[in-house]
From Swiss-Prot:
Disulfide bonds: none
Organism: Canis lupus familiaris
Family designation: Belongs to the complex I subunit 4 family.
Record-given protein name: NADH-ubiquinone oxidoreductase chain 4
Record field: catalytic activity: a ubiquinone + NADH + 5 H(+)(in) = a ubiquinol + NAD(+) + 4 H(+)(out)
Gene name as annotated: MT-ND4
Keywords: Electron transport, Membrane, Mitochondrion, Mitochondrion inner membrane, NAD, Respiratory chain, Translocase, Transmembrane, Transmembrane helix, Transport, Ubiquinone
Amino acid sequence: MLKIIIPTIMLIPLTWMSKPNMIWINTTTYGLLISLISLFYLNQPNDNTLNSSLMFFSDSLSAPLLALTTWLLPLMLMASQHHLSKEPLTRKKLYISMLILLQLFLIMTFTASELIFFYILFEATLIPTLIIITRWGNQTERLNAGLYFLFYTLMGSLPLLVALLYIHNFMGSLNFLMIQYWIQPLPNSWSNIFLWLACMMAFMVKMPLYGLHLWLPKAHVEAPIAGSMVLAAVLLKLGGYGMMRITTLLNPLTNFMAYPFMMLSLWGMIMTSSICLRQTDLKSLIAYSSVSHMALVIVAVLIQTPWSYMGATALMIAHGLTSSMLFCLANSNYERIHSRTMILARGLQTLLPLMAAWWLLASLTNLALPPTINLIGELFVVMSSFSWSNITIILMGINIIITALYSLYMLITTQRGKYSHHIKNIKPSFTRENALMTLHLLPLLLLSLNPKIILGPIY
């Protein structure tokens, strides 16, 4: 595990010691090298886990998320160059250091083999994210967004700490590898119901569950581009990962406790998709679409069948790359037009034809067009939820239709129509931006050729 963690730590001195004109090039190329190392973890030759040390392990659930995390750092650096071009040098270096620190915490969170260690790192990811949002965001509302983000996450995860200490007290260990062999069924008592809620709430807030999702659109809209990318792509996946890890402890209570949360997710999925249809703000639309996709993952994890777990893992990876790409596209519009309102950015296809192609591809992957892995994940989730209850097929069908509607609405509003006069002399798309979009789309297309490497622990 150290062969990823130590190079990531060494990125920080690299940032501070590079020449001013070489900072971006050095950190990006080095970050890409680290992400290539992490691809080795995707090859899981045997059924049991890779125990790198007492603290770190990697299995077929954490490996895809680990690869996604390392892959995203160079992409964030590529996307942030324009945003930081006017900043003084030290502030640029601080920003890059924050991103590297966040990546370090995320890598360690996904590979921690002990639940308390996992919890500490899960909370540590909050600090760099908060600094990135509140220091480099665009509007003054970013402070409000940071407060929302901080308090929602902390209020959700403090009960988890108490619950973990309680579990540790009567189990004697919180190591993932030990827990598997100690599973005693939790009976339906009030104390166990509260234990279940305390364990799940932290991850439900992080996912976010409909009703606890108010921090997400705020944080996404106010964050700078790298903040939005890492929030959508990796931080939401922490919730799904934590849920998949901790549900094994809480059986058979989950079967009994999952109903209200399933209902809330299925209802919230349709509600947030419908909210997307009446958004004027581009970033806000993409943020709400993330909530609706993550609701599918919550449903899948709570059903607890092998198929639904496979669907949840595939959907998490697919959504990470897709939403990150959409945020990059929204940002490239914002850098030219200086507004997130979609109506002001209409008719861009005539001015930026290549960008329009990227918009089309990103929208199609977002609405889960075959043969992308978004479709594979959604199919698994839809099929497993149908076998859990037949009624869900109606809700899932409505959701898929609305998803297609808002994806195409986003595409048509920004790309078609007559462009307004204030955007006649905008800059053309840079090679950097085209490379960025390619690096988002390439993994999505390549994974559709061999989806089994991201189907998680069951496959």
